A protein has these predicted regions:
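RNA-binding accessory domains that recognize and position tRNA/RNA substrates
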Residues: 1-156, 168, 180
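Cysteine-nucleophile active-site neighborhood
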Residues: 160, 165-224
């Protein structure tokens, strides 16, 4: 989960025909703090030129804040390096995706009852829309916890393995994930990953990862 949301304009009532919940309501429901009225373009330019800074977004019902305490907590935050956040967001129980496909106009989320392939997805923080795309391609998807052993994964007799997206430092998650992936590689099954999963696969194959100074935003993902 995101811990905070920063937007320029005030959040207004939704008007998109696909909308089912006001963003303000969703933030409150999930206890995510938000703030409006910030010059987000200026903030983006600052991040572009200086890298991502530490920062705090805080809420107080009384409107009073202990600035010194908030500042000290921000300064002390160690950042994402060496943080295994995947274990905090992974599924606690293995499950089979319910088969809903990607959204189509005038149809919505149609269920797929036709399966040609079986994919085991290792969940490091998987997005539902990725699962929907698997359904588009007639894949049955079994989602397992990030610490599930290679033996248990292979017991599902999958046609392929998917390593999902997720938060945190890939090297930290790799402390347990690399051994699992290396065991799966030995079985010559098709394996691919997205985002964090892709980075962990690279680590398993002897590559190195490091945090980008400026990161990337939107669709501008650099490839070298």
């Amino acid at each position: 989960w995101a811990r905070g949301v920063i937007v320029n304009s005030e959040i207004t009532s939704p008007s998109n025909y696909r909308s089912f919940l006001h963003l303000d309501t969703w933030l409150k429901k999930n206890k995510i703090v938000g703030i409006t009225g910030l010059d987000t373009r200026s903030l983006t330019n600052f991040i572009r030129d200086n890298g991502a800074p530490k920062g705090t977004v805080s809420f107080s019902k009384s409107g009073k804040f202990n600035i010194k305490k908030l500042t000290n907590n921000t300064i002390k935050w160690s950042g994402l390096k060496n943080l295994d956040l995947a274990e905090t967001v992974t599924t606690q129980k293995n499950y089979v995706w319910k088969g809903l496909k990607t959204w189509k106009k005038n149809i919505g989320y149609k269920k797929n009852n036709k399966y040609s392939f079986h994919v085991v997805a290792i969940d490091y923080g998987i997005k539902k829309n990725i699962l929907r795309y698997f359904s588009d391609f007639n894949c049955k998807v079994t989602v397992v916890s990030c610490k599930t052993s290679a033996e248990k994964i292979l017991n599902f007799k999958p046609n392929g393995i998917f390593l999902s997206n997720g938060p945190g430092d890939p090297a930290a998650t790799g402390r347990y994930a690399i051994d699992i992936i290396n065991e799966l590689i030995k079985k010559n099954l098709p394996i691919f990953g997205i985002c964090l999963g892709h980075q962990i696969l690279a680590l398993a194959l002897g590559g190195k990862t490091k945090k980008m100074k400026l990161g990337h935003r939107g669709a501008n993902h650099p490839v070298k």
